[in-house]
Amino acid sequence: MGDPKFARSKTQTPTHPWKQARIDEEHALKEKYGLKKIGGMKEIWREKSALRRHRNQAMKLIGRVDTSEGHFAREKIDLINSLCRKGLLVEGASIDDVLQINVEHMLSRRLQSVVYYRGLAPSMRAARNMIVHGHISIGKQRMTVPGYHIKKDEEEILKYSSNSVYNDPNHPFRVEMEKLRLTMVTDEEPEEVGAPKAATEDFVE
C-alpha cells in the first residue's frame, strides 16, 4: 500500500546473459559510442528498454481499427511529436516510422554523442570526459551526465561551459578542433543525425 520505498528500474536485462552474438554486438556498440568500459552494457540495455517502450506504444496504436480521430488520434500525434522533439524522427514522419528506430538511433541522441557530432570533442571518449568534468553546457546549465537525451531545440544552445578553459576560442584545443572540423565536412546536415532512414536519406555518425 502507498508509494514504494524505492522506484523500480525500468531497464530490462537480457533474458539469456551469455549469448555470444548479442555480447559481440553490444561490445561493438560500446566501443563505437564511447560507453563506460565497466558497466557500458547497462547503458545499452537502458536504451533498448526505452526503445522497446516506444515500439510497444506505436504497435498498440497501429493495431487500433481507427486512430484517425478521438483519443487514439491525439495519442498517436503526441507520440510522433515527442519523438520529433527528441530528434528520433523528423517532421512529417508517420507512426510506422517509429518501428524503424533502432538502438543506434537512441544512442546517437545521448549528449555524449551529440557533443562529438557537433564537433565539440575529437572522439566519443573525449566527449564523455569533457561532460563528466563540466566543460559542456546547454544554455546556462552545465551538464555532467553523458547519457542525457538532448532535445532538438537544445542542440542550438549546446556549447562549452562559460567557466571552461575550452570556452576561449584561442585555446590550443579549440584551434586543433577547428582544423579537425574543416577536414571532416560532409554533405549531410548534422540535424538529421539520429533520424530513422524512413524519414531521412542517411544516418550520419
Q: What are these model-derived regions, one by one?
A:
Residues 129:
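DNA-binding alpha-helical recognition surfaces that contact promoter or target DNA
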Residues 1-118, 137, 141-205:
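Ferredoxin-like alpha/beta domains used as RNA- or RNAP-binding modules
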